[in-house]
Amino acid sequence: MDTKHFLPLDFSTQVNSSLTSPTGRGSMAAPSLHPSLGPGIGSPGQLHSPISTLSSPINGMGPPFSVISSPMGPHSMSVPTTPTLGFSTGSPQLSSPMNPVSSSEDIKPPLGLNGVLKVPAHPSGNMASFTKHICAICGDRSSGKHYGVYSCEGCKGFFKRTVRKDLTYTCRDNKDCLIDKRQRNRCQYCRYQKCLAMGMKREAVQEERQRGKDRNENEVESTSSANEDMPVERILEAELAVEPKTETYVEANMGLNPSSPNDPVTNICQAADKQLFTLVEWAKRIPHFSELPLDDQVILLRAGWNELLIASFSHRSIAVKDGILLATGLHVHRNSAHSAGVGAIFDRVLTELVSKMRDMQMDKTELGCLRAIVLFNPDSKGLSNPAEVEALREKVYASLEAYCKHKYPEQPGRFAKLLLRLPALRSIGLKCLEHLFFFKLIGDTPIDTFLMEMLEAPHQMT
């Protein structure tokens, strides 16, 4: 079932008018309803709202999703190019040609500290090309030019360690030890002197280290730039601005008898209806959301309202044992949910969302980023520019990853663990909608205006 277009007629209308009206930080003006979404969409039941109808630029849609514009100039990130090192080296002195060999593995030249390299004669006489395939230090197979000299990985690593750690060596013999593939590790002093004699440059190692340092600094700058474009501080502010003041209710309701006569399904539906109003207020505080076309704003809210609400009450319920805490301040115990016939989906919420959030101590900034990822869904049907929405989602990803690395450096897998909650959230959201449709169908559960409109909106099956 595709639930992406579940914003009902009047609800979408209210969304539109809210999207076009400025908001204050302190209070929220009650949105008004409009009888239709546009051609082909009718509202059975003719639900009425006490709030006056506001005009909207889309197909006669009127109020609840107002959005304040929050233009932010795009920030570009520059990735510096890595400088290349160029070193000219003289070819080693060549003498005493040997018989030709078929492989460099067969080469065992007696290389001494004097740097004389004995290699076979090359039929073409192009000795420079031949020396590229062997290490100028020990005669092993060369992996390329390192610090100015063609050398193997072993000699390259030895020279780099020596320079970076500023090591000093002593020779036990006459400082003229044979350095070849088999004996290169016997005398570090002579091996290092051979590296210098063949042209390896200490400054090249230092420059390489500086480039690595510059890359790390650029990564930090890129992280900072990503956060400036989608600041997690503003996402947190959005969460705090619409957070229900349930703290005063928690203790009073924690002791509720699990067999309370209050119908948990009714309580949940009433809380959802209440939260639909604040969902608009939250969305327009998310960076760049209000810069999208009004039609796209409505589509995105239609597509994600159920997952957005479930994520909120799941995180709010972290401190609750075997139950969830609703926006109305009511505590619904799992036993009550089982008695009402919704125990299976209720248990999934507790185990796949609430418990996981509790175990990792998910904070409100992370919750807000996950909800913003849900909001910016480029797969929502009917978007005028899905690529733009996808770009905004990518910015949230980048900001969340940077936040996790900065706030929880000892948890390198935290970002991935957060994203793993999204598939569960999606699956649970779809199942909850199935239950809501069932309750609406049998008609024995009071469903308030806003939520009813959401369920009456046209939808598509997937």
Swiss-Prot record:
There is a cross-link at residue 4 (Glycyl lysine isopeptide (Lys-Gly) (interchain with G-Cter in SUMO2)). Residues 348-368 are annotated as: Required for nuclear export. The modification Phosphothreonine is found at residue 82. Zn(2+) 2 binds at residues 171, 177, 187, 190. Its main location: nucleus. The keyword Zinc-finger applies. Pfam families: Hormone_recep, Nuc_recep-AF1, zf-C4. Residues 135-200 bind DNA. Composed of three domains: a modulating N-terminal domain (AF1 domain), a DNA-binding domain and a C-terminal ligand-binding domain (AF2 domain). Receptor for retinoic acid that acts as a transcription factor. Forms homo- or heterodimers with retinoic acid receptors (RARs) and binds to target response elements in response to their ligands, all-trans or 9-cis retinoic acid, to regulate gene expression in various biological processes. The RAR/RXR heterodimers bind to the retinoic acid response elements (RARE) composed of tandem 5'-AGGTCA-3' sites known as DR1-DR5 to regulate transcription. The high affinity ligand for retinoid X receptors (RXRs) is 9-cis retinoic acid. This is Retinoic acid receptor RXR-alpha. It comes from Homo sapiens (Human).
